[in-house]
A protein has these predicted regions:
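S-adenosylmethionine
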Residues: 1-198
Length: 198
């Protein structure tokens, strides 16, 4: 893959001797993942009805790999019922690792389109409060759609500058997730136009 020169130089400086291994990953097959919505169905019950073979993502209890070259889970009724979220396994990690407990007050600072927020809401199990924020009001609409589809309750949708949230909610939240908007490198294999746009 031909990467932008500025990007290559930045990554060489950042990664040093690991740069070659990093760039080699762009030539490897892409991994497709889905995360079971445990707010609606247990992992065990989903595996009983899963319409295709799934392989567990080793570090995510409700994450699975699927063969994205031959199946389209975004067209299955289970997708439209909110039983799973299509998400790269690496993107599942932040919400999985945040130690959310039922009853917590949780803020997802950069929440759209909802992959992390839906997992945080499932962990809350209808208790506590989830504040899902995204600076972009148009992206917040998609966030709302996904939270509704996933059956996540006790949620507040915000579209505010992150710096202002502290004045609205001083010392309120038990847990805060900031998976700041990315620069797009993860999309390089999915959409070649992202390489040019970087």
């Amino acid at each position: 893959m031909n990467l932008p020169k500025v990007f290559e130089e930045k990554m060489k400086d950042l990664l040093g001797s690991e740069y070659e291994a990093y760039t080699a990953c762009y030539d490897e097959p892409r991994h497709y993942g889905l995360r079971v919505n445990t707010a609606k169905i247990s992992v065990e019950d989903f595996l009983k009805i899963a319409p295709w073979p799934l392989e567990p993502v080793p570090w995510i209890h409700n994450g699975f790999y699927y063969d994205g070259d031959n199946i389209q889970p975004s067209k299955h009724p289970y997708y439209f019922a909110g039983l799973y979220y299509l998400q790269e396994p690496s993107a599942m990690t932040p919400a999985d690792r945040l130690p959310v407990e039922p009853g917590d007050r949780v803020l997802d600072v950069c929440a759209a389109p909802g992959g992390k927020a839906t997992e945080l809401g499932a962990k809350l199990g209808g208790t506590g409060v989830l504040a899902a924020n995204d600076l972009s009001s148009s992206r917040a609409k998609g966030l709302l759609k996904n939270l509704e589809l996933f059956g996540i309750g006790n949620v507040l949708i915000l579209s505010e500058e992150p710096g202002k949230l502290v004045s609205y909610f001083p010392e309120y939240f038990d847990k805060i997730l900031i998976d700041a908007p990315c620069s797009g490198e993860g999309m390089f294999r999915k959409e070649k136009k992202m390489v040019k746009a970087w």
